[in-house]
Amino acid sequence: MMARLKVPEGWCVQAFRFTLNPTQTQAASLARHFGARRKAFNWTVTALKADIKAWRADGTESAKPSLRVLRKRWNTVKDQVCVNAQTGQVWWPECSKEAYADGIAGAVDAYWNWQSCRAGKRAGKTVGVPRFKKKGRDADRVCFTTGAMRVEPDRRHLTLPVIGTIRTYENTRRVERLIAKGRARVLAITVRRNGTRLDASVRVLVQRPQQRRVALPDSRVGVDVGVRRLATVADAEGTVLEQVPNPRPLDAALRGLRRVSRARSRCTKGSRRYCERTTELSRLHRRVNDVRTHHLHVLTTRLAKTHGRIVVEGLDAAGMLRQKGLPGARARRRALSDAALATPRRHLSYKTGWYGSSLVVADRWFPSSKTCHACRHVQDIGWDEKWQCDGCSITHQRDDNAAINLARYEEPPSVVGPVGAAVKRGADRKTGPGPAGGREARKATGHPAGEQPRDGVQVK
């Protein structure tokens, strides 16, 4: 796996996104780089699968997969792999070496994610064997980490290896003035296709100011996110400070999306009108995403700059989207997706570090909505927006009550164990009956279960 960047004390990694305005020649060159990355990724997946197959067949072992090892193998075969089928011309010199390195690194990371998941060391969703990337299905993107890449001093252009200097729609002064002052250094520039546009994300190492930038360092607030409101902010004294309305960008664009989707369904796939409708559909989806992203960034930045301690819920957003069979479940899932409930916590997790505030994530099972903030009585309230407490007869608004309870949330005492120890997949579960040898013993590969996680990889 690729080595992680060690961020020095007082520094952090930030990304600045700009929309590119390339010429036709530059757009064609970027498209070639997208394809070159896919080619290198697919070749790496093929090589890794061949190594696994050889190990399973006769026990042939290979070196531990890494970017360095596989890049050397790629350099020995690229003259045979990157050949135009019609002209027989070798085309790999037309693209920067960074495109091929990015594809190989992506495949290596995907391989180790799969192996870590099989070994039970990776949290999150189950990850399978790396799959091949296909044009039209895979997101077009390429990352440049070395070479002639920079933000031009004129604040209107970015320079990329091989491709050259590309004009941007937005002014790049946000990052250029940091670089000019010596407070930032460019680490990588990633170009990706976003609908009908090309976006460049400039990842930089930024030196943060040492002084606290929080307006109210002693303020302690709870933030409840939801569908009715984007966020409700309250303090521990029971005062609701802010009620942020939900822009509902998907609901606003749903009528147009349906109209364009129906029009495209009546077109012949691959025709001119079909491509026009697809472009229009992409623009609408991009608009929805941009509106949602803008409101979430404005909200989370304001919270991180204003309050010293912010408490949010540890929601299982993915689990909430799996609700099926209930009345109105489809519309509810769409509304939950439109609200992006997990995004504010993700934004606050790094923005609080930037501005000197702190973030506390409440326990997933903390009953913030159904606990009366006056008498602490807990009762089932269903989906009701307003409810009356059976203990003290006070009527509560669901979101306001949850925000107040979150502001009063106290972190439980830490368990005995090594500091920073992560809970691995299944480590917090009780053991139960199962087949001898565990999950790997059920795989009929003809090899002992203990040898399976490595799949022919010799760890040196």
Swiss-Prot record:
Enzyme class: hydrolase
GO cellular component: plasma membrane
Enzyme active site: D224, E313, D399
Record bears the keyword Nuclease: yes
Pfam families for this protein: Cas12f1-like_TNB, HTH_OrfB_IS605, OrfB_IS605
UniProt keyword Hydrolase present: yes
Record keywords, A-Z: DNA recombination, DNA-binding, Endonuclease, Hydrolase, Metal-binding, Nuclease, Transposable element, Transposition, Zinc
Sequence positions that bind Zn(2+): C372, C375, C389, C392
Region (Disordered): 415-460
Superkingdom, natural source: Bacteria
Molecular function in Gene Ontology: DNA binding; endonuclease activity; metal ion binding
EC identifiers of the protein: 3.1.21.-
One GO process term, biological-process aspect: transposition
Disulfide bonds: none
Family from the record: In the N-terminal section; belongs to the transposase 2 family.
Function: An RNA-guided dsDNA endonuclease. When guided by an RNA derived from the right-end element of its insertion sequence element (IS), cleaves DNA downstream of the transposon-associated motif (TAM). Cleaves supercoiled and linear DNA in a staggered manner 15-21 bases from the TAM yielding 5'-overhangs. Binds reRNA, an approximately 150 nucleotide base sRNA derived from the 3' end of its own gene, the right end (RE) of the insertion sequence (IS) plus sequence downstream of the IS.
NCBIfam families: guided_TnpB, IS607_TnpB
Name the record gives this protein: Putative RNA-guided DNA endonuclease Rv2885c
UniProt organism field: Mycobacterium tuberculosis (strain ATCC 25618 / H37Rv)
Organism lineage: Bacteria, Bacillati, Actinomycetota, Actinomycetes, Mycobacteriales
